[in-house]
Amino acid sequence: MLTKSKQDPHLNHILNARHHDPFSYLGLHQDGTQYILRLFQPFAARAWLQTASGWVPLQRSHEAGLFEWKGNTPPPVPCRIRLEENGHSWETYDAYTFWTTLSPEELYLFGEGRLKQAYRTFGAHLCEQQGVAGVRFVVWAPNAERVSVIGNFNHWDGRMHQMRVHGSSGVWEIFIPGLTSSDLYKFEIRNRQTGQILVKTDPYGFSFEQRPGTAARVTAHGHYAWQDAEWLEDRARADWLHAPFNCYEVHLGSWRRDAHGEFLGYRELAHQLVPYMQEMGYTHIELLPVSEHPLNESWGYQTTGYFAPTNRFGSPDDLRYFVDQCHQAGIGVILDWVPGHFPKDDWALARFDGSALFEHEDPRLGEHQDWGTYIFNYGRNEVRNFLLASAHYWLEEFHMDGLRVDAVASMLYLDYSRKEGEWLPNRHGGRENLEAIDFLKQLNVMVHEDFPGALTIAEESTSWPMVSRPVYLGGLGFSMKWNMGWMNDTLSYMQHDPIHRRFHHDKLTFGQIYAYSENFVLPFSHDEVVHGKRSLLDKMPGDTWQKFANLRLLATYQMTASGKKLNFMGNELAQGREWNVNSSLDWHLLDLHWHQGIQRLHRDLSHLYRQVPALHELDFDAHGFEWIDCSDSDQSIINYLRRARDGSFVLVLLNFTPVLRSGYRVGTPLAGHYREIFNSDAGYYGGSNQGNGNGLQTEAYPWMGHSHSLVVTIPPLGGVIIQPG
C-alpha cells in the first residue's frame, strides 16, 4: 500500500500538486464493470461514501490522504461524503464528481475577446450545481501546468482543489460545494516551463480582505434593490452634448474623515457628500479610482482589483447605495478607470501564471519606467476582454454613468516618456500603439451601444486628433476629452504678477483656436494641487486680498469659457495647502470669511451655469462663443458673448489686473437694458463690491464691430456676467 505512489504516476502528480487533469483520476470513474471513487483528503483521518444502501467506509490507500471505494453499482452523483478530522466529522460532496458548467460558446467568445460579461463566467460565483450549493471558480492561466483554489476552507493547501483545464483555452474551473459568501481564497499556480509556484489573487475578484491581506473574498451578487430606474431612463434620453456638466472630482478617502481620522464609509459619504454636492450645484461627481488597490498613496491608480470596489469604505452593496443616492439626488457618477497600466505586486496580475500574461514580455513594450508598472498587452484577445469586461462591470453592476479613462496618451504612443532605443515601433514603423487604439475604439463603441447616455472621458494630454469624435468617422469614440492645453495656459497666465500679464495675453486667447476641435472638459484636477505644484490659492500672486480675488476670477473664467467643467475637491474651499491623500480637506477654513466667500462663489456660479442656457448649451459649438474684444492686452481685459441655441446670450467681462476699470465701453449686438447677473467682486464673496448693480442701458454708439455699446464697470481682478433684460 505504501508503494502505491511509485506505481501510479497519476497519484504522484496529485500528491505533488502537478496534475494537469486531476478530474481524469480523482472522482468517480468506471473501470470495466466496476466503479472507483478516488478522494484526496490529506487532513482527514477517515472517510465514508453515501451509496444507495447507506454510508460505506472508504479505504485509505495511501498514507498521504488518498481514499478509495470500489463497487459494482455507481453511487448517486454528485457523491456525498463524510469526513473525520481531529475527532470532528462533517458531510459534504466530492468536488470531482460535479460536471463542468462552462459552455463552448463562452470559451470561444473569450478567446475572441468578445465575452463582454466575462465577469459572469470568471471569478468566484455562488451558485447551485446539480442541486448542490457552492462556489464555481474559473481563472485564465494558459501557461500553467496546474492551478488550485486555496483558501480558509482547505488549509490553503494547493493539493486539495486542483482545477480542470478546458483544452487549449487556458481556462481552469472547479466547483467546490458548501462554500459561502465571505470565504477567502487565492489561486496557486505551477508554471509549466519552470515549475515555479505562484500564489495569486483572483483577477476577477469581486471583493478582497482588508489590507495588508490580499486574498479575494467570495461575494454574493444581485441582492441590492436599486431605486434609480427613472434616472437611468432619463439618462438614456438625455442630450448630454447640450446639457450642463459641472463635475466635482473626489477622492473618497480624503474628502472628509470622522472624528478619529478614520475613513467614512460609502453609506456615510452618501449622507454627507451627496447633500453637499446638491447644495453646491454640481451635476456630476468623478470618483478617483475606487477599484481595489493596495497603497493609499497611489490614489487608486495602481489597481489590483479591476472588478472590486475597495473595501476601505465598505462592501460592494455599500458602493451601490452611494451611487443610488447620487442618482436620486440628480447627480451622475463618473468612475476614474485605469486600463493603461497595472502594478508589479507579485500577488496580483504581474506575471500571473509565471509568464508575461497580461503584459508584454519585452520591457520596451511592457513597462512604464516612470511609474514602475506594467503595460497591458492590448493585442491579446483575452487581455482586451478582461479590460472590456471590467468597464462593462462597473457600468452594469454599479450603474456608473461613465468612465474617465486615465493616461490615454501613454496608451496611444509606443514612445511615451521613452528615449531613443527604449521603445519598439509598430508594424508600419510608426510610434502609434495600434493595438491600444483598437482597444479604445472597441471600448467606446461598447459603452455607447450597451449603456445609452453613459459618457467616456479621456485624460489625453497630446494633440492626437479626433479623440472625442465617433469611431465611424475615424475618431477614438470618447464623449469628451480633458483640455490640458487650456488648463496649462490658464494656470501659467494666472501665476504671473498682474503687471506682467499684458505680455502673456495670448495664453487667454489661444485656446479658442482649437476649442471646438474636440468636446472639451476644462479641468482643474487633483494633478494640479500635488507634488510641489501648490494649491490653486497658493499659485495666485499678490497679497491675501489679491490671491482670493484672483481665485474668484479664475473660477469665473472657467465657468464662462467654452467647455464642460471639472474641479477637484477643495478648490471650492480655497485650500491653502496641497492635497494630502492621508487627511481630510481643511473644512475649518470655512470659519474664515475669505474661504467662505470662495465657497459661496463656486455655489452661485454652479447654479447660474445650470440655469442659464447660454453658459452650457453650445459648449462644443463655435456658434456658442463670440469674442467682443480679445486684444486689450494693455489692460489685461477680455470680453466675450456666450450664446444658447435660441440665440439668447450673456456678456462676460474679465479684468485680470487689480485696477478698477470704470467707464469701460464694450460693444453689444442688442440694444436695450442689461442687468448684472453675477459679479465675482461682490462683498458676499469677499470682494470690494464694485460693479453695475443699478443696471445698464445701451447707447447707439458703434463699438467693437457692434451697432450698440455699454459703458460698464469691471471690478479689479474680477469678472461680471451681464444679460439683456
UniProtKB/Swiss-Prot annotation:
GO terms for cellular component: cytosol. One of its GO terms (molecular function) is hydrolase activity, hydrolyzing O-glycosyl compounds. It is an enzyme of class 2 (transferase). The active site is at 406 (nucleophile), 459 (proton donor). Its EC number is 2.4.1.18. It comes from the Bacteria. One of its GO terms (biological process) is glycogen biosynthetic process. Keywords: Carbohydrate metabolism, Glycogen biosynthesis, Glycogen metabolism, Glycosyltransferase, Transferase. It holds the Pfam family Alpha-amylase_C. Pathway: Glycan biosynthesis; glycogen biosynthesis. The keyword DNA-binding does not apply. The keyword Endoplasmic reticulum does not apply. It catalyses: Transfers a segment of a (1->4)-alpha-D-glucan chain to a primary hydroxy group in a similar glucan chain. SMART domains: Aamy. PANTHER family: 1,4-ALPHA-GLUCAN-BRANCHING ENZYME. Belongs to the glycosyl hydrolase 13 family. GlgB subfamily. Catalyzes the formation of the alpha-1,6-glucosidic linkages in glycogen by scission of a 1,4-alpha-linked oligosaccharide from growing alpha-1,4-glucan chains and the subsequent attachment of the oligosaccharide to the alpha-1,6 position. Monomer. This is 1,4-alpha-glucan branching enzyme GlgB. It comes from Methylobacillus flagellatus (strain ATCC 51484 / DSM 6875 / VKM B-1610 / KT).
